[in-house]
Structure formats: C-alpha cells, structure tokens
C-alpha cells in the first residue's frame, strides 16, 4: 500500500508541473530595475490586486518599496499611474496585501515597521492620496480582509 501511495504521489506531482497554459497570452510585463529584492527570498514583487474605478480597470502590485498602481484598461498599453511608498521599505519587506472598498485601497505589510495605509482612489488615474497611515491599529499583517456583508 505504501508503494502504491508513493508511486501515485510521484505521478501526480509530475503531472502538476507539466501543465501548459491554454488560451493565455502575455499582454504586458513590467519591471523596475531600481527596486531591490527581499533579503529572504530575493523577491521584488509580492502581491497583486485589481479593481475598477471611474470606468477604468486598475491593477495593484506590491513591491519591496511600496504600492504600484497601473491603468490596465488597455492591457497592451498598461502603465504605472501612481506609486505610494510603504511606511517601511527595502530588503526586509517580503509581503504586502491589499483590498479595496468604496473607493479606498487598504494596504498592509507583514514585515518591518509597517502600518495600515488607506489610499483614496477616487481621482485615479490622476492621483491617489494616502488618507491614513498609522501603526496604531495594525503594525504588521500578512493579509487584510474586509467583511463587505457587514458594510
């Protein structure tokens, strides 16, 4: 029985890495050479989130430096429209997390001397304004969740 389990696990793991992308096409790729990788894993980018504001589609990417907001309405011509520096930044930052609600983006980080940042998105793509940046409520957090059912 143990041999059968071992063989099955081996076959399943090989099949899982042999998957191809079907009907997917890379439309845009962004990288910023001035950003540093994390000291733990050398990852520069660490989270992605998306939302619609003012009839445009936006993507959020977390990095070791902060929050990058992209207009992806025309995916092949996507562009970074806003950058918000994290309360803490640099190689100590491994993970950021985001959630949006009612025109605001909520941002947290799992490392460093971080904070809860609340960013007003209502004037995108022209501006994104940090309206709250404090560690009074949250200093570090791996994930953020908004219970939308409770309003």
Language-model regions, residue ranges each:
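Bacterial Sec-dependent N-terminal signal peptides
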Residues: 1-22
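Feature marking well-ordered beta-strand scaffolds used for ligand recognition
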Residues: 18-151
């Amino acid at each position: 029985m143990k041999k059968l389990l071992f063989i099955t696990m081996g076959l399943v793991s090989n099949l899982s890495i042999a998957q191809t992308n079907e009907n997917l096409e890379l439309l845009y790729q962004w990288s910023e050479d001035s950003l540093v990788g994390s000291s733990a894993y050398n990852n520069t980018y660490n989270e992605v989130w998306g939302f619609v504001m003012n009839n445009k589609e936006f993507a959020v990417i977390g990095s070791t430096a902060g929050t990058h907001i992209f207009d992806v309405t025309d995916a092949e011509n996507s562009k970074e429209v806003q950058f918000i520096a994290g309360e803490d930044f640099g190689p100590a930052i491994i993970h950021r997390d985001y959630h949006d609600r009612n025109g605001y983006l909520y941002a947290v980080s799992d490392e460093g001397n971080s904070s809860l940042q609340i960013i007003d998105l209502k004037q995108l793509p022209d501006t994104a304004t940090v309206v709250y940046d404090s560690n009074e409520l949250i200093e570090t957090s791996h994930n953020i969740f908004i219970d939308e059912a409770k309003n």
